[in-house]
Amino acid sequence: MRNTLRVIIFVLAVAAFLFLTNDYWEGKLLGGLSILISCSVVFIAFVISLENRKPAHTITWLVVLGSFPLIGFFFYLMFGRNYRKQRLFQKKAMLDEQTFLKFQGQREWAIEQMPIGEHQRPLLQLAHRIGKSPVSLATETRVLTNGEETFSTIFEELEKATHHIHLEYYIVRHDEVGQKLKTILIEKAKKGVHVRFLYDAVGSWKLSKTYIQELRDAGVEMIPFSPVRLPFLSNTINFRNHRKIIVIDGTIGFVGGLNIGDEYLGKDKYFGFWRDTHLWIRGEAVRTLQLIFLQDWYYMTGKTLLTPEYLSPELVHYDGQGGVQLIAGGPDQKWEVIKHLYFAMITSAQRSIWIASPYFVPDEDILTALKIAALSGLDVRILAPKRPDKKIVFYASRSYFPELLEAGVKIYEYSKGFLHSKIMIVDGELASIGTANMDMRSFHLNFEVNAFLYHTDSTKKLVADFLEDLKEASPIDYETFQQRPLSIRVVESVSRLLSPLL
């Protein structure tokens, strides 16, 4: 399908012609609309079937179109046209791969030097092969727990910037936290520091024009990622930049779950306390984070900054605390990078798998791997929020609980506030922390970035934090959970049916 949209428009035009030339004026409006909707829905269903999507995705779209033709038609135009994903990002994918190979090299020697078990080594090989990122043995990391520690550390490091500041965020708000960030960036820009800021056009759609203009007037290059002007006709509305990246002078980096907003400090009345995790990075691995930003910057602006000024080979090497790997995932990748690495982490486990995720909507591969791990006697724990953020995702998530509980997975509901951490810890030795949720949107559609940690001090801190979080959580009992009302089960089932679209 070279251009499905054009064909859909053609079908609509034919239907309109039949409508206008109809000699039977009685019931003309209803008949015309029926022809319009029927032709469009049938054609879209035909296109979806030819795209050879995963069966669950195909069936879900067919059910939606069959049950709600008009709504399904417009919903598909906005969110369903993934057939163009390869074409949209083919050039970006090719350039990204060439850039990583040029600036990162192969670095197999680092994998061989990693002091890990042989059963864990294939995970590093996989991350290197599909993530195009070497493991660094010369990088310091520090876990930042919750908003107060994260923002105070970020603002402190921004104040020290002397050459450049690069930021990439999904959500930016013009509230107290956003104003504090703006003040620092304007001050730095006026002092000659190069400040570049990528913000997602959909995630930050509420960001005021005044906020943006004030930054631009001060010399900050403020660029929206994939702006959407006509939602129903946009090819990119479904592919959002969910990354949260800061790079300062090419030596300090940040990545994790927190966007820019007051709610991440626990100031939202509904959510209250906000539980989240971020990562401070210094050393060699920051180079990978810089590359990810620079490639996204080039994709949106056409301006290349792949120069020694921003990618100096003479990085200061810090004493590593184990291995650190920064991995980007997204619709521009040939492989479902983040999902494959999550799967590999789960299947490499020998003792335990601990997961914290605000949106737990796994696909069949991840779901099966978790059940098999639990049935094999491993300590599998999932920490999820008790309070819903996005209700349809919340109920879809809970629909997976019975089969996981029955397999022996321990599921806990965090009740102190809202849990937004995106963490996986395996055997207390390997960990992932970043922007990717344990859901299909992060696996298939969003641009994400995660840090994978191997035998680091930060992994120990994540373990300690997870155990502390369990003190604020309640375990779900299988028998009790099975007694929930039928109405709730129906909502969960319908939400799960839509989960491939979430």
UniProtKB/Swiss-Prot annotation:
Record InterPro entries: Cardiolipin_synth_Firmi (IPR030874), Cardiolipin_synthase (IPR022924), CLS_N (IPR027379), PLD-like_dom (IPR025202), PLipase_D/transphosphatidylase (IPR001736)
GO biological process: cardiolipin biosynthetic process
Superkingdom to which the source organism belongs: Bacteria
EC numbers for this chain: 2.7.8.-
GO cellular component: plasma membrane
Segments forming domain PLD phosphodiesterase: 237-264, 415-442
DNA repair in keyword set: no
Transmembrane segments: 7-27, 29-49, 59-79
One annotated GO molecular function: cardiolipin synthase activity
Compartments in which it is found: Cell membrane
UniProt topology in membrane: Multi-pass membrane protein
Pfam family, one: PLDc_2
Record's catalysed reaction(s): 2 a 1,2-diacyl-sn-glycero-3-phospho-(1'-sn-glycerol) = a cardiolipin + glycerol
Active-site residues, record numbering mapped to chain: H242, K244, D249, H420, K422, D427
Purpose of the protein: Catalyzes the reversible phosphatidyl group transfer from one phosphatidylglycerol molecule to another to form cardiolipin (CL) (diphosphatidylglycerol) and glycerol.
HAMAP family, alphabetized: Cardiolipin_synth_Cls
Name of the protein: Cardiolipin synthase
Organism: Geobacillus sp. (strain WCH70)
Lineage: Bacteria, Bacillati, Bacillota, Bacilli, Bacillales
